[in-house]
Amino acid sequence: MLQLIKGFKDILPGEADRWRRIETLAAVTFGAFGFSEIRPPVMERTELFKRSIGEDTDIVEKEMYTFEDRGGDLVTLRPEATASVVRAYIQHKLYADTPVAKLYTIGPMFRRERPQKGRYRQFHQINAEAFGVAAPYMDAQLIFMLMILFSALGLKDTRVHINSLGCAQCRPAFKQRLLSFLEGRKADLCEDCTRRIDRNPLRVLDCKVDRCRHVSAEAPQITDFLCPGCAAHFDEVTGLLTDLGVGFDIDKRLVRGLDYYTRTTFEVQTDRLGAQSAIAGGGRYDDLVKLLGGPDQPAVGFAVGLERLVELVAMEETVSDVAHLRLFIAALGERARRRAFGWMCELNRRGFDVEMSLEERGLKSQMKTADKWNASHVLIVGDAEMETGSLILRNMKTKAQQEIPLGDVPGALITMMDNRQEN
């Protein structure tokens, strides 16, 4: 029997429903903030990622799925989405339509990492990118929007960690000081970091090897080298977050693993996933559009790891009341099944999640099916109930039951489900 490739995962129907609800809620949330969806391809020219992510990064050096196609072009399955969105933004001149472009995308990424819990070689991200605004208001708005999404998903114990990486004006002095420090600690670094320090010493700060992390903890801090403009920008971002009621920790050791970040960088972390604490991350990349051949346009964005988000939502047991409002109709007898089928189709037509058994089965068997389907309510209707004119609606969580007059179906069910949606 053929099996999955190592590091890949099938998302089965029950779990896929949770994925779809999260993706839908993200789209609605981002839309309320003026973001529009974009769908770039999953494959790009390799050069795009080398130039944007950085040739000295682990992603480019070790993790990308890169191959030569039959035409002789070197292509790569995207390891992240920002570079693709920027490429599309430039190629299609989206900057010509409006001075500010807010875009989001949801889809799979590919990295040949060591598979572990919550981390796969095909993984999925929700990305949001905003172009054309250099003001710190946009940084704060994106972080606020992200936390609104997490709140809507019912997530708890999440915290923003934020830092500034400076700009082309102030970063060189920091790099020089960092390089001097690392040269004296070469013996304590891993082989990769020893090789990288001359070309890009910042990569050492992002290394996950324990002995390199110990060295990083003692390294100079970039916030001590910020130019007046970067310092003011960072102060304004944190001030705006405070005004918005977003809690955060200033993490002077936070360095994202992509070369294109400037100024603001941040992660949202949780202590509920063990060592894999980051569930989202992003920052400002004011030089990337120009680097990839576009106009000099500032930009800021973030990415959310969907696999980790799904795991967290499953821990909370609910995305929202609406997401779990699922009705199963248990019909006993042909007459009851005929009526129930009509009700189900009418409710399906109105967009509600309703299911029933289309073949003759006992009540016990149907209740097991309803439970496996994660029904929130079961409507029990048999030929006897058809005679008395009173049906039973059971709440599967509380086990409470209520009677619904036969003449009120499906109107009573539509009203109930509409009211739950409004709540």
Swiss-Prot record:
Alphabetical list of PROSITE patterns matching this protein: AA_TRNA_LIGASE_II (PS50862)
First-level EC class: ligase
Signal peptide (residue range): none
UniProt keyword annotation of Ligase present: yes
Origin superkingdom: Bacteria
GO terms assigned for molecular function: ATP binding; histidine-tRNA ligase activity
Keyword terms, alphabetized: Aminoacyl-tRNA synthetase, ATP-binding, Cytoplasm, Ligase, Nucleotide-binding, Protein biosynthesis
Keyword Ion transport part of the UniProt annotation: no
Subunit field text: Homodimer.
The family this protein is said to belong to: Belongs to the class-II aminoacyl-tRNA synthetase family.
Annotated protein name in UniProt: Histidine--tRNA ligase
Organism: Desulfosudis oleivorans (strain DSM 6200 / JCM 39069 / Hxd3)
